[in-house]
Amino acid sequence: LMSEILDTALVDPDDDFVETVARRLPILMISRVLGVPDDDAAQLFHWADSVVYHADPEFADVVFDRDDTDPYRLLPFRSPTSVKVFEYAQRLAEAKRIDPAGDIGSLLSDSDDLTAQEFNTFFLLLVIAGNETTRHGLSHAALALADHPDQLDRLRADPGLMPSAVEEILRWSCPQLHFRRTAQVDTELRGVSVAAGDKVVTWYISANYDEAAFVDPFTLDLGRSPNPHATFGGGGPHICLGAWLARLEVRVFLEEICRKIHRFHRAGPPVRIRSNFINGLKHLPLELEPS
C-alpha cells in the first residue's frame, strides 16, 4: 500500500506531501481495520478533521449562531460534526451485523457489552486516534529528512538502524503535544504536592526534548539509543492503544522511502494546524526526487 501511494505521488503534480502521501496511508489502514469501505474513507476522515481541529478555521465547525451550546456538551470537542460520524457508525454497525467480516467494526457491532452511544464514541475515537497523529508523524518525518538528508543516507546505507530510526522519528515528531491526567492518590512530584483529584497536564513534547533525558535532543539522530520518548504517553494504563500500528506504519514508510526516494526538497514553507493539542502540519510542499 505504501509503495503504491509513493508511486502515485512521484507522478502527481500536487507537491503537498500531506495530501499526496502522509494522510493516505493511515486513512486507508485504519479504515480497513475498522471495515470501512475505501470509498467512504475520505469523507469520514474529513469529518474527523472537523471534530479535532476545532480551533483552526480551515477545518472547524464551531457553532457561532447560537448562545446555548449545551446540546453539544457531551459531544467530543462540542463539535456538531460528531453527530455525522455517529450516524455513519450506526449505519456501519447495522451493515456489519447483517454481513460480518474479520474486522474491528464487525467485532464491536456484535458485542453486547457496548451501548449504541458507547459504540459511536469508541468508533470516533479510533477514527481520530488511528489517523490524525500518524499522519502528522509521517509529515514531520518527511520534513525532518528534507532538512537532514545525511540521516536519510545513513539509514539507506545501514538498514539495521530501522528500529532506532522509527523511535527517533516518533520522538522528533511527537504529534500529540499533551494530555491531561487525574491524580488518583496524594503524591509529590519533584517537590510539588499533588492531591488526589488534581488535574495534571503531561507535556509529551517537552519530555521528548528534555536535555536531562536526551543527549542533544534538538539533533535528529536515527541511531539514538536509548530513546525513552513519551510520544505514546510514557507507559501505564493510558499508553496509546495504537502504538504498535503507528510503529508499523512509520517503519514501512521509512523502508519505502529508502527504496524509492533519493531526496525530499522543500517547495515552500510548511503550514501548521492551529492547535495547542496536536502538533500537526496541514500543508507540506515537498518535491520528491526519485531514487
Q: Which positions does each model-derived feature cover?
A:
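Cytochrome P450
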Residues: 1-291
